[in-house]
């Protein structure tokens, strides 16, 4: 994945309030350096540190995660907004697939986007043991 694509995606995710616009400037190098960066979830005031990790098969991924109260409706709204934003950013050439259901008491929803060899995942996960629900953004980065 080209570094400018990641920066462009982050810009698209951040358009909105002034604080989100400020956040965009901080994330222009997301995926192009090993530095952890802070990203604000679109439509919310929730910020998190995004981190880069290595993938066993090669390359790396940038992960961002936002915690909500367990099964909070706001988490579902934020997840749907993030899915919509990523879809709009990637355009009609992107394909989106939903992950299969899991046999587990916690809720899980993953939407994976593929476009021109790029992969972006947006997920919503209930963690009963932690009494929290998470929205995750994962961007595959080829090194």
Regions found by a protein language model. Give the residues of each.
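Long, charged/polar, surface-exposed segments that mediate recognition or autoinhibition
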Residues: 47-108
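Short, low-complexity, Pro/Ser/Thr/Gly-rich segments in the mature regions of secreted, periplasmic
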Residues: 129-143
């Amino acid at each position: 994945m080209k570094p400018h694509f990641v920066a462009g995606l982050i810009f698209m995710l951040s358009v909105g309030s002034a604080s989100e616009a400020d956040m965009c400037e901080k994330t222009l190098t997301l995926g192009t350096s090993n530095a952890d960066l802070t990203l604000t979830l679109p439509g919310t005031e929730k910020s998190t540190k995004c981190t880069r990790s290595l993938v066993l098969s090669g390359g790396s991924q940038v992960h961002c995660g936002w915690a909500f109260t367990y099964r909070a409706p706001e988490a579902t709204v934020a997840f749907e907004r993030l899915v919509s934003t990523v879809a709009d950013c990637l355009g009609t050439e992107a394909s989106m697939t939903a992950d299969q259901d899991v046999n587990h008491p916690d809720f899980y929803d993953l939407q994976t986007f593929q476009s021109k060899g790029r992969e972006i995942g947006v997920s919503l996960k209930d963690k009963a043991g932690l009494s929290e629900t998470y929205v995750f953004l994962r961007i595959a980065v080829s090194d």
